[in-house]
Amino acid sequence: MRHLLLITAFLAMLGPTSAHAEGSESLWDGLQVHGFASQAAIWTSENRFFGNSPETSFAFTEIGLNASLPINPRILLSGQLLARRAGDMYDGTPELDYGLADITLASSNEQRWGVRVGRVKNPLGIYNETRDVPFTRPGIFLPQVIYYDKIRNLALSTDGLMFYGESYIDQGALSLTLGGGQPVIDDNVGWTFLRNNYDGEFQTDNKTGLVQLWYSTPGERFKFGLSGIMLSLRFDPGQHSPLRSGTTDIFYWIASIQYDTEDWTLSAEYLREPLAWDDYGPLFPNFKTTVEGYYLQGTYRIRPNIELLMRYEEGFANRNDRDGVRFSTRTGGLFPPFAGFSKIWTAGLRWDINRQWMVRAEYQRHHGTFVLSFRENPDLGQLREYWNLFAVQAAFRF
């Protein structure tokens, strides 16, 4: 990452020279700065979600500040700092959400080719690139069976390179992105993939790659795409770890489709995620599974500033074990069967008070606990199969 930042700084130094040479306007005239903040209150009938939600949790806060600066017609610098508090998973420490140089290599009326260098948001699915901005999400929470908050950072961004191409024809637009680099790893990785906080740390095993292909009709009324990321994680055990040095291989891919009109939007996505654990030792035997998730979602704008949301989603820790029985048996009954799946109905309301302020309300009916974080729910005996969630959120932007 240090080398990427040096490259970005070098490009920034080149930019002012080009701008002054053109003698037209100051480099800083194109600077844009924006920000947002949101606060939510979350209540659940059972189980912990974004904090101590059975007692009502206020531990979901987002504060972001972003800026963009065109150095010259071919180079755009942009970045965002984000402070995000999400229950026990994220503590609100400000972090670099993204910071990159977008370099156009070739451009015409029919196509554009370029490369993004730095910490780049992964273009996975419909919502991953904009998931941290409350105003661009369809609800307070994204579909958790695909956009996991319990392990958000791993799929969120990459420190590396993203090459992209866009082609514009009479029938619409076609875009392709190819990239690779280092994912962002935090403590939630261990809690999710090893189901505990073992002594040791994860590192990437130099096998990270990303691809995205999108097609959209003119006006983007209809669009569909395929996107995926492949990575290998290596666990380096600490002195007191009962595990050996093992690897977890991940192939996370999404098929997406969306139809948009003036008053309503229909979206559907399908996730498949093959996983393989190897060489962790007898406490965590070698194992392979394929996670599966999908949702169907509709939003309807009854007024320009009022929007209704309805969504149904399902997710499974093993697509061949949809009732979770084999999952529970494999762990000796430590995990209840319903920890292997989630089936969720969601209804929501959005009200844009004005351009700066928005409020939301959302209700969810859950069957299963697959989407929950083990970090927030370490006592598996306290988990309940059926539970409700109600949340409200206020958001501001400038």
Question: Language model features by range: what are they?
Answer:
Residues M1-S24, G139:
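Cleavable N-terminal export/targeting peptides
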Residues M13-P54, I126, P337, I353-W357, ...:
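Outer-membrane beta-barrel biogenesis signature
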Residues S24-V33, A40-W43, P54-D186, K207, ...:
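Outer membrane beta-barrel
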Residues G51-N52, L100-I103, G225-F398:
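Outer-membrane beta-barrel pore domains
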Residues E55-T56, I151-L154, E201-T204, S245-T247, ...:
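Short Gly/Pro-enriched turn/cap motifs at secondary-structure boundaries
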Residues N128-R131, V189-W191, D321-D323, S373:
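Short aromatic-enriched loop/helix-cap "lid" or pocket-rim segments at secondary-structure transitions
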Residues A173-T177, D187-T192, P237-G238, Y280:
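A short secondary-structure junction signal
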Residues T192-P237:
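Loop-centered beta-sheet repeat module
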